[in-house]
A protein has these predicted regions:
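Membrane-embedded beta-strand positions of outer-membrane beta-barrel proteins
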Residues: 48-52, 100, 144-146, 174-178, ...
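Residue-level signature of outer-membrane beta-barrel architecture
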Residues: 41-42, 90-92, 135, 165-167, ...
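Transmembrane beta-strands of outer-membrane beta-barrel pores
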Residues: 52-58, 104-108, 137-139, 148-152, ...
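Short sequence motifs at beta-strands and strand-loop junctions characteristic
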Residues: 42, 56, 76-80, 121-125, ...
Length: 401
C-alpha cells in the first residue's frame, strides 16, 4: 500500500496543559512522529530527518485577517514556540527496524488565566524521546514503542503496542493497537503538589486498496483517562476526574492519472464524556511539478461544541475584562478555558518539497490558522471570547542511507 496510509495508536496526552490549545496542537502535529509500524515490509534503507517548527499565535483585534480578509488591527501576541526534531529509522537484519525521535521545543509568551483575558507570562522548555521497535512478517508487523517527555512542571511516560495483518493479496490490512500514558503534573504555582493522570487508548483500523488509484481507510479509537484533568493555571477550573473519548477517522486517497497528482481527503469525528463533539475535515492535493518539485495546498476545517461545564463570559466581564465571571455556587464542575468552549476554525496551508537527488529531500510547510466562536456548526459559541489566530512554518530535511 505504499505510503498512502500509516496507522498509529493516537497520542493520548498532549504536552503541557497550560499551553497547548487547538491551534498549537495543529501546529505541533506537523512534527514527525514514530509512524514506522504497519508497513508491509521491512525498509531496505535507513532514513534520518530533521525538522524545525516556528509557531506564533495571537488574539486578534480589529486588522486584516489573512484567511477571511476582515480587519484585525490591535492583535496581541500570545504564545510562541520553536521546536526542533530529529528522527531516525534504521533497518536491522532484514526483518526488524528501530525508529527514534528526539524533540526539543521552547515555549514563551502569555496564556489567559480565564477565557481570553488576564494574560500571564510564562516560558518553558520541553524535551521528548520516543523509540519504536518493529518486527516484520510475511503478511504483517508488530511494533512496541515507548516515550518520555519532560518539562519544568510536566512529565509524561508512554508505552504502545501495535500490530498489522494483511490479506494474501495485500489489498486489505487490519491494524490493532493499544497505548498507555502516565503523566505527573507539578504546577509551579503550587510547589510540593503533584497531580497524576493516566490514559489508556486503543485503535482498530482497516485499510483497503479499491483500485490502482484509490485507497480508503477507517479507524476507530477509544480512550479512557483517569486523574486530574483540571488546569491549575486557570482561575476557575475544576473538571471531572475521568475523561473517555471515541474517535472515528475516515480517509480516501485518489490518484489522478491526467495530472499525476493525488487528492487526499479525511473526516474525523470526536466525542468525549466532557460533552464535547468535534468534526474535522481535511483536504490536501499533492501535485508533482517535475524536476523533483512537489506542491501541496492544504485545507482543514474544524468545529466543536462546548463542554457541559464550560462557563461563558458574563455581562460584567464583557464590559470589563478584568472582572472574571464566577461559576454558579452550586456548580460541581466548571471551566473558563476557551479550549472547552464551542468554536470553529479554518486552517490554510501550503507545502513545497524538493527531491534534491534519490537520497536527499527538503520541504517547507506554512499554515495559517484562525478560530472564531461563531464559526462552529451550531453557530452559538461564546461571543465574549476574543478571536484567535496562529501561524506556523516548518522546514524539513531528510536523507536516506
Amino acid at each position: 500500500m505504499g505510503n498512502f496510509f500509516r496507522t498509529k495508536v493516537p497520542a493520548v496526552s498532549p504536552g503541557t496543559s497550560k499551553v497547548f490549545g487547538a491551534a498549537l496542537v495543529t501546529a505541533a502535529m506537523a512534527l514527525p512522529s514514530l509512524q514506522f509500524a504497519c508497513a508491509e515490509a521491512a525498509p531496505d534503507q535507513g532514513v534520518v530527518s530533521f525538522k524545525y517548527l516556528h509557531y506564533k499565535d495571537s488574539q486578534i483585534g480589529d486588522g486584516v485577517s489573512v484567511i477571511t480578509g476582515a480587519s484585525s488591527a490591535g492583535s496581541s501576541s500570545r504564545m510562541g514556540v520553536n521546536a526542533y526534531s530529529m528522527n531516525a529509522l534504521v533497518p536491522v537484519a532484514g526483518e526488524w527496524s528501530i525508529g527514534t525521535t528526539y524533540t526539543s521545543d521552547s515555549v514563551s509568551g502569555a496564556s489567559p488565566t480565564y477565557h481570553s483575558s488576564a494574560l500571564t507570562k510564562m516560558t518553558d522548555l520541553r524535551r521528548a524521546v520516543d523509540v519504536e521497535l518493529t518486527r516484520y512478517f510475511l503478511n504483517g508487523s508488530l511494533s512496541f514503542g515507548t516515550g518520555y517527555s519532560k518539562e519544568s512542571d510536566y512529565i509524561s511516560r508512554s508505552f504502545s503496542l501495535q500490530g498489522s495483518l494483511s490479506t494474501e493479496d495485500k489489498n486489505t490490512t487490519f491494524t490493532l493497537g493499544a497505548s498507555m500514558n502516565s503523566d505527573d503534573i507539578n504546577p509551579v504555582t503550587l510547589p510540593g503538589i503533584t497531580y497524576k493522570k493516566k490514559v489508556y487508548a486503543g485503535i482498530f483500523g482497516i485499510t483497503r486498496v479499491l483500485s490502482k488509484n484509490d485507497i480508503v481507510q477507517l479507524n476507530l479509537g477509544y480512550s479512557n483517562g483517569n486523574g486530574d484533568f483540571s488546569d491549575p493555571y486557570k482561575l476557575y477550573d475544576n473538571r471531572p476526574s475521568e475523561r473517555n473519548n471515541t474517535t472515528i477517522l475516515a480517509r480516501w486517497n485518489h490518484h489522478i492519472d491526467m495530472t499525476d497528482g493525488t487528492a487526499k481527503v479525511s473526516y474525523r469525528y470526536y466525542s468525549d464524556t466532557f460533552g464535547i463533539r468535534a468534526h474535522t475535515f481535511e483536504g490536501e492535493y499533492v501535485q508533482p511539478l517535475g524536476r523533483g518539485w512537489t506542491v501541496s495546498p492544504i485545507l482543514r476545517l474544524y468545529s466543536q461544541s462546548e463542554a457541559d461545564f464550560y462557563v461563558a463570559v458574563g455581562a460584567a466581564e464583557k464590559a470589563d475584562p478584568t472582572k472574571p465571571t464566577k461559576p454558579t455556587v452550586d456548580a460541581v464542575y466548571y471551566s473558563e478555558d476557551q479550549r472547552m468552549s464551542a468554536f470553529g476554525a479554518i486552517t490554510l496551508g501550503l507545502k513545497v518539497s524538493k527531491q534534491l537527488n534519490p537520497d536527499w529531500l527538503v520541504d517547507v510547510t506554512y499554515e495559517e490558522y484562525e478560530q472564531r466562536s461563531k464559526w462552529g456548526l451550531n453557530g452559538n459559541g461564546d461571543s465574549g471570547l476574543a478571536p484567535f489566530g496562529a501561524r506556523s512554518i516548518q522546514i524539513g530535511l531528510s536523507k536516506k542511507f
